[in-house]
Structure formats: structure tokens, C-alpha cells
Swiss-Prot record:
Reactions mediated catalytically: tRNA(Cys) + L-cysteine + ATP = L-cysteinyl-tRNA(Cys) + AMP + diphosphate
Homology family: Belongs to the class-I aminoacyl-tRNA synthetase family.
GO cellular component: cytosol
Cofactor: how and how many bound: Binds 1 zinc ion per subunit.
Protein name: Cysteine--tRNA ligase
Pfam name, any one: CysS_C
Location of this chain's protein in the cell: Cytoplasm
Gene label: cysS
'KMSKS' region, short sequence motif: residues: 265-269
Lineage: Bacteria, Pseudomonadati, Thermodesulfobacteriota, Desulfovibrionia, Desulfovibrionales
Amino acid sequence: MHLYNTMEKKKEPLIPIISGKLGIYVCGITAYDFSHIGHARSAIVFDILVRLLRYQGYDVTFIRNFTDIDDKIINRANKEGRSSKEVAEEFINAFHEDMDRLGVLNADIEPKATDYIPEMIECCQKLLEADKAYITASGDVYFRVRSFPDYGKLSGRTPDELRIGVRIVPSEEKEDPLDFVLWKAAKPGEPSWESPWGRGRPGWHIECSAMSEKCWPLPLDIHGGGIDLIFPHHENEIAQTESIVNKPLAKIWMHNGLVQVNSEKMSKSLGNFKIVRDILEAYLPETLRFFLLKKHYRSPIDFSFEGMNETERSQKRVYECIAEVDKALERKSWDSGGSSSSILAELDEQFSLFMSALEDDCNTAAGLGHLFNIIHIVRRALDDKALYSTTDGKVVFEQFREIIRKVDILLGVFGQKPNSFLQDLKTIRIIRNKIDVNQVEELLSKRRQAREEKNFVQADEVRNTLASLGIEIRDTSEGQVWDIL
């Protein structure tokens, strides 16, 4: 297993610090609003990582925190006349609901910032005692960035380079513009806690330092998050933590790429902010999950409804293949003969390549390419009349079903009952495309009657009318079957 380490700017073999065990910490959401697709991507990326590592036999402890005290949470609480705790709890619960729908496994430990205030105060005290931090006249506590010689090692830039073109919160009380807040002095209308230097609340960065140190013996094997967290959040985490413990915060740093919308940065100001639960009103959860797996996790991914529609078509092809295999396996008796050895070898080779792709920095994009090769191979077997009903054919289909079972374990896709999924897919596409089912059924009835009367011209006219409505027709032994183009 090799992973790209942001710190070293290269892929490295994953070697656990504690034999057989892995500690993974990923920065979670700030709980002030519903989760967007950027949150979903990060959650799914690290869900795949954890699934893969457990499949390989590692004892994984997966930690994902919640920031439940922050300016944005406080602002929303004040605006809505609620407490910060109520706001945070609402959106933590909403996050869990959304991730459950997307098939994201629960983290083993989910620390909330407000449960670790004493640990954060202790971190601040240690930094003050080491002269790595200072208290201002107003009661804020700041970290001295230049007291940490390695500051900038994650982003690969020096402190002076980081000052250029970076939005820095100004303060006349700072010794250096790059210094960042560890503790914010209490303000009216804000939650606050007692500390040796007065009431206040923690800064964002110290939260993760305290929680990660408390939840796993440092260094972590892997620390992860979105690429937008490299600076300042992860850079500041490193400076704080390593100034306290005098050893690395993490061995490997992993960062997923951002989500764009129609090739533009996703932001509320551009009006292209995509909330997970809004998308799931129009698409099945597995479609969004599958869409987010189609690009390598370190690359940006461009969200579009056209891309989601193409993902649906790909899903449909896979589930239709699974349904046909399941139907073939319903046979009560099988003929002897057939020749499956070459097909089985092809399936084994493609699944081995699928696994190699995942083990090469979680390359789901390449892995899915091999999965579609497997679908193509099985399609050939389904069309091979000399093989279809034989015992060798049964072996091929059972092998395929075992591969799909493993794909579901590893990627969390294609594990549903195929006919149920295909019906759900048809239903949500009917709703999304505002298809009048009664109109479709009336036209199908007219076409059926025209075919019975051998009026094929009229039958073709009805087919064309249905096509103009976005409906395709297939004539089967069981009658007309319609679906959405």
C-alpha cells in the first residue's frame, strides 16, 4: 500500500508505527450548516481508505472531529435566537444523516471541540510556558509563528512567502502578522470558559491539536482533510502540536482535491453551492457516491448534472449486468461442458489490477476502469450460448458475484439488490424529469394495439413520440419495457 504524502511531496509505503494498527485523524465539519458536496467528497475519500485498510487486515482507529464552537456557529445561533450548542447539534445530526445515506461508515471516535476545553487550555499553557505563545492586553492568546523554525514545511513555503497573497486576520496586538490565535477573549453574547488568563474560547487550530493528541498516541499514522486545509489549518496544527510534544504530529499527510461546479469554484457568493440533501432529492445516494469515486481523490472534481446523469447511465449498465447474472444463477440444473478457464483468468487478472489501483494511493478512477473491464468480460459470457447454461458458466457467474461483493466492501457501491436499485433509479428519474406516467402508459397501449393490428407505421410514430418525451422502448418476450433515455 502506497499513499501520497503531502509533507514529502511523493508516494510512500504505508508502514504502521504500531505493528498492525493504524491511527487516522481527519478534520471534520464546522457544524453551522448542512453538508455540501465538498464535505461529502472528503468523507467518502477517507471512507474508502478505511475500508481498504480494514480489508487488508489492519486494526484501524478512525477519528473524525466536529468543530462545535466557532464564529459561524455563534453568528447563526445569535441570528436565530438559539444557543450555539443547539445549532451545532442540529448540523452534526444532519451530517450523520447525510453520510449514512451516502454509505459512509461511522468514525470510531468523533470528538467534539467543546468536550476538550481543558485539554485545549493545557495546550495553551504549555505553549506559554515555552515562550511559544503570548497573551495580549485584551486577553487573547497568540502563537508565535517564528518560534517554530519548520513553519511552512507542509505547504512548502517560508513564513515570508506565506504572508504574500494570503488573507491574514489583522490585529494591532499581534507581534507578527502571521501569528494566529490560540484562545479568544470572551465577548458579550458568546459562549466562554474559564482559563488562567480569563474567560474565552479556543481558536480553531488548537482544537484539532488537543483532540488528536488525546484520541491517539502521537504521531498519527495518517492525518487527512481537504487540500484547502493545508494552509493555514494544518500548518498551524503542526506548529502547535510539535512545539508541545517535540515529535511529528503525523507520519503521512493526505489531502483530497476540491469540488468545482461547472468548472467554477463552489461558493455561496457565486450561487453554485451544492448541499448534499438537495442533490439527493433528485439523485440516488449511490449515484453521488459513485460520481465522487470517478476521479482520483487528489484531483479536483467538476460537479455537473450532466456528469451525474452519465454516472446514472454507467450504474444502470453495471446493475443490469448483475441482474442478468442473478437471473442466470437461478437455474436449478446446469449442463456439463463449456470452457471457463480463460474467462476466469481474465476476471482474476482484472480484479488483481483493480486491487493494485486501490493500493496505489487509493486510485478509484483507475480501479473503476478495471471494474468496467470485468463487466465487459461477463457480458461476453452472458452472450455465449455455449457457456451460459453450463457448469462452467455457473462458475464464471459465481466468481463475478464474489467480485461484486468485494467491490461493495471496498467502495460501498453495487451492493444493492439489482432489480430494486433499477426500479429506484427509474422512479427518481421519472420524478426529476417530470414524466407523466399515465401519458406514457396510454401511448404504450396505442403502440401495442397498432402492433397487434400490424400497423407498424403507427407503432413507429408512437415510438418516436415517446422518444421525444425522453422515453425508450424495448420489446421483450414479456412485452414492452420502457425506461428513460
